[in-house]
Amino acid sequence: MFKKSKYFTVRPETKREIPEGLWIKCQCGAILFAKDLERNLKVCQKCAHHFRLTARERIRITLDTEDFEELDAGLAPRDLLGFPGYAERLAANQKQTGLNEAAISAEGTIGGHRVVLVVMDSHFIMGSMGTVVGEKVARAAEHAVRNRLPLIVFSASGGARMQEGILSLMQMAKTAAAIGRLDSAGLLYVSVLTDPTMGGVSASFAFLGDIILAEPGALIGFAGPRVIEQTIRQKLPDGFQQAEFLQEHGFVDAVVPRSRLKDTLIKIIGMHQAG
């Protein structure tokens, strides 16, 4: 009289694995498709936040072609002071980034103009400046003098590299002296400050440019805002140490969005050469 109900087992669909890095969350909360973000030069389409670039990415969007001459590619850091764990950290960062150090120097063209370029990479020990980074900046300036070329430096650094102690701090004087020789030769030096430009880098070559540009929202300064607040026991103004704040107070000549940065550099170089 009563039939037994039949039940069917519904097999759950196989869980689809989403590739890592396919989506990226911006600080504004927007979820961005990685390929769209890359096409937009790694600038958020919702809030215009400028994500940090690797040195290779920066070179690719700045130089006319990827066919450039890398300078001093064989220079690599060593653990000169026997700092605990430093050798292992260097090896790990070299493997992760594919770089020898936190900076790449090169000669290439921008808008057809030959230039010497130095690009720092904050993904390598926070772009900190040790002996090799300082040497690359100094040699790039000397290369520019020998070949009568303008120098463009993209800074992205947390400051001096503590694992190299006084040897790292010495790079501040060395790079400043090299930039001084470039200036004496009457050659153009454009400094581009990107997020972050802090510590010994900001206190040396980063602020010695004939023209100083910055990307929107970049953190720029010597000590971090938290350290300053704890020292002076006062609340800092909103936006303190951001690129726009520094422009308002005369420390930066212009804040230029990444999409317009290459054209701006081309105009600056062209005007300097025409003069």
Curated annotation (Swiss-Prot):
NCBIfam families: accD (TIGR00515)
Pathway per the UniProt entry: Lipid metabolism; malonyl-CoA biosynthesis; malonyl-CoA from acetyl-CoA: step 1/1
Transferase among keywords: yes
PROSITE patterns noted in UniProt: COA_CT_NTER
Cofactor note: Binds 1 zinc ion per subunit.
Complex and partners: Acetyl-CoA carboxylase is a heterohexamer composed of biotin carboxyl carrier protein (AccB), biotin carboxylase (AccC) and two subunits each of ACCase subunit alpha (AccA) and ACCase subunit beta (AccD).
The protein's role, per its UniProt record: Component of the acetyl coenzyme A carboxylase (ACC) complex. Biotin carboxylase (BC) catalyzes the carboxylation of biotin on its carrier protein (BCCP) and then the CO(2) group is transferred by the transcarboxylase to acetyl-CoA to form malonyl-CoA.
UniProt keyword terms in alphabetical order: ATP-binding, Cytoplasm, Fatty acid biosynthesis, Fatty acid metabolism, Lipid biosynthesis, Lipid metabolism, Metal-binding, Nucleotide-binding, Transferase, Zinc, Zinc-finger
One Gene Ontology term from the biological process aspect of the record: fatty acid biosynthetic process
Residues binding Zn(2+), per UniProt: 26, 28, 44, 47
Reaction catalysis annotation: N(6)-carboxybiotinyl-L-lysyl-[protein] + acetyl-CoA = N(6)-biotinyl-L-lysyl-[protein] + malonyl-CoA
EC number from the UniProt entry: 2.1.3.15
Top-rank taxon: Bacteria
Domain named CoA carboxyltransferase N-terminal: residues: 21-275
Subcellular location: Cytoplasm
Predominant location category: cytoplasm
The protein, known as: Acetyl-coenzyme A carboxylase carboxyl transferase subunit beta
Keyword Phosphoprotein annotated: no
Pfam families noted in UniProt: Carboxyl_trans, Zn_ribbon_ACC
Protein family membership: Belongs to the AccD/PCCB family.
Gene Ontology cellular component terms for the protein in this record: acetyl-CoA carboxylase complex
Cofactor(s) the protein requires to work: Zn(2+)
Molecular function (Gene Ontology), one example: acetyl-CoA carboxylase activity
UniProt zinc finger (C4-type) residues: 26-47
Species, as recorded: Desulforudis audaxviator (strain MP104C)
